[in-house]
Structure formats: structure tokens, C-alpha cells
Amino acid sequence: MGDIAATRLGFMAELAQQRWDDHRYYHHSRINQSLHLLSALSFLTGYVLLFFAPAMAALVCWLVGMLSRQSGHFFFEPKGYDHVNDASHEHKEAIKVGYNLHRKVVLMAIWAATPLLLWADPSVLGLLPPPIDAMSWLNNLGWLWIAVGVGGLLYRTIQLFFLRDVQTGLVWFTKILTDPFHDVYLYHRAPLFLMKGQLIDPDVAKR
């Protein structure tokens, strides 16, 4: 019983640490934080849609959630030396548990290429019903994007099993699925600070 409790405590402690490291290293920009708030709200909407319109959920999560989220990282997050955490951009990229910028480029390229696959083979080797109109084509695209999202999540999780350990992979998996809830909690005030002209979070290193 004690071992089980210790394992659970270790899991939750690592989840808190992964969340803290992700925030303090990769979310200095108030614009990035605000875009993460938009992304989080989009993903929460997608979670609801998933129960009765899964393909539409994928369209919302990718087109709004992922694009806003990743544009924040690529275009607005500082890439210079991080004096707050005493770490170079290269170091932060190297220690990133999940998808660093390089891995994100690969994932987003795969996502962007899926419409070409659907254009070349509308039924995707017979896995999807041939589209008869624009809505059915978008429905098929949504299912492809679900496959890309689930595949990307499982790929990195299993990769972490071997690069780190099983718990790290499972913690990261849990973190990704619960990030929308946590991001709303963390960044709900970011747009207000941004409207006041604050571009960088001065308290990013404070718990």
C-alpha cells in the first residue's frame, strides 16, 4: 500500500514539475500566453465536440487550438539567452520533454500535408467513405487530423518510455491531455496584462 501511495505521489510530483518547467522555460511572452489561452479554450470546446462531432472537434483543435498555440511559440517567444532561468535557447530545446521546435516543425508539416493525401486518395485506401460534397470532405479531413493528433501523442509518449522511463512518458501524456484546463488557470489574465503594454511576464519564474 505504501509503495502504491509513493508511486502516485511521484507521478503527481513529476506532473507538477513538468508543468512548472514548461511554463518557466517556454512561456515568457504575454502574447504567447494569450494565444495559449485561446488555444486552451479551443481545445476545451473540442473536448465537448468530441462526444458528438469528433471530426469537427479535430478541425477546431487543429485550426484554432494548434495554430494559435504554435504561432505563439514560433513567432513571439524570445529565442535569446534566458537570464531568468540562466539557460540558452539551445539548452532549453535540448531538455524539452515533449515536442521542441524542431519536432513541432515535423509534426506540423505532417498535419499540413494531410489535405494533399486526401486530394490524392479521397478514401485514404478505403479507410474513409468517399466524399460526396465539401462537408463530407471536411469530415474525412477531420478524421485524418484525429489520426495525426493521436499518433503524435502516442509516438512521443512511447519514445519517452525508452529515452527516459515509463512514468515520464505517462506523465507527459497526462500533461498534454490536461494542459487546456491548466492553461486557462495559468493564463486567464494574460490578455489583461498585454492590454496594459506588458509584453514579458516579470513573474514567470515565480511559482
Segments and roles (model prediction):
Residues 17-47, 93-107:
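Membrane interfacial helix-start motif at the N-side
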Residues 38, 42-45, 64-75, 105, ...:
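Alpha-helical transmembrane segments of eukaryotic organelle membrane transporters
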Residues 45-60, 116-143:
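Helix-coil boundary and interhelical linker segments in multi-pass alpha-helical membrane proteins
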Residues 110-130, 197-207:
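Alpha-helical transmembrane segments and their membrane-interface junctions
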Residues 45, 112-119, 148-156:
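Alpha-helical transmembrane segments
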Residues 48, 52-77, 150-163:
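Hydrophobic alpha-helical membrane-embedded segments
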Residues 2-23, 74-98, 158-207:
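Membrane-proximal soluble regions of multi-pass membrane proteins
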Residues 99-123, 185-192:
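C-terminal halves and exits of single transmembrane alpha-helices
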